[in-house]
Design a protein with these regions (language model features):
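Unchanged
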Residues: 46-70, 79-132
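Conserved beta-strand and immediately adjacent loop positions that scaffold enzyme active sites
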Residues: 18, 27, 116
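Residue-level preference for beta-strand/loop junctions
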Residues: 13, 37, 88-90
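Small-residue-enriched segments and motifs
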Residues: 17-19, 69-72
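Acidic, metal-coordinating catalytic segment for phosphate/diphosphate chemistry
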Residues: 1-18, 24
C-alpha cells in the first residue's frame, strides 16, 4: 500500500500575525474592523503559500493601514486550541517599535476592512481590544524585553521559569 502524500497527513494549523505599532508618546495603534466586533491590531492570516509570520505581519499592516513596517521583534506566540466557534491555531505578535508622527499622520485605511483607527494609551487599548488580543498585548507589555508563550491566552510555565 502506498502511503498518502505528506500534505494529506500532516495537520494544518491556521496562523495569523499582528503588529504592535506605537507613536513616540507611547500610544498604541488600534483598528476597528468592519467584519467583526471590537477593536484589533494591524495584522491578519498567514498565507498558506509559504508566507512567514513576519511577512504576513508586514503585508497585512501595509494592506490595512498603508504603513511599511521595516522592523519587528517577536514578543508573543499564542497557541489556540480549536473550539466550536473558532478553528484554533497559532497567533504571532511582533513589536514593530515607534513610528514618527509623519508616518502615522499618513495612514490610509483599507475601507472595506477597517472603518477607523486610533492611537490610545495601553490601558485604553486593553479595554477596547477583544479578549484574545488583549491577553497577548498585556503579556507583551508585561515582559517588554522577552518573548511570551501563551496557550489559549494564558501563560505557560516550564522548568526554565523556575531558575533564579
Amino acid at each position: 500500500m502506498v502511503p498518502p502524500p505528506t500534505e494529506e497527513v500532516l495537520p494544518r494549523i491556521p496562523a495569523s500575525a499582528s503588529a504592535l505599532i506605537w507613536d513616540r508618546r507611547g500610544r498604541l495603534l488600534i483598528l476597528n474592523p468592519t467584519y467583526k466586533g471590537g477593536w484589533a491590531l494591524p495584522g491578519g492570516v498567514i498565507e498558506a503559500d509559504g508566507e512567514t509570520p513576519w511577512e504576513a505581519c508586514r503585508r497585512e499592516t501595509r494592506e490595512e493601514c498603508d504603513l511599511d513596517v521595516q522592523r519587528g521583534r517577536l514578543v508573543c506566540v499564542d497557541f489556540l486550541r480549536p473550539r466550536p466557534n473558532r478553528p484554533g491555531g497559532m497567533r504571532f505578535l511582533f513589536d514593530c517599535g515607534p513610528f514618527d508622527g509623519d508616518a502615522l499622520s499618513r495612514i490610509v485605511l483599507q475601507e472595506e476592512e477597517i472603518s477607523q483607527f486610533r492611537l490610545v494609551g495601553v490601558e485604553k487599548a486593553l479595554h477596547k481590544l477583544s479578549g484574545p488580543i488583549r491577553r497577548r498585548v498585556a503579556a507583551a507589555v508585561q515582559h517588554p524585553r522577552g518573548l511570551t508563550y501563551l496557550e489559549d491566552g494564558q501563560p505557560v510555565r516550564g522548568p526554565m521559569d523556575d531558575r533564579s
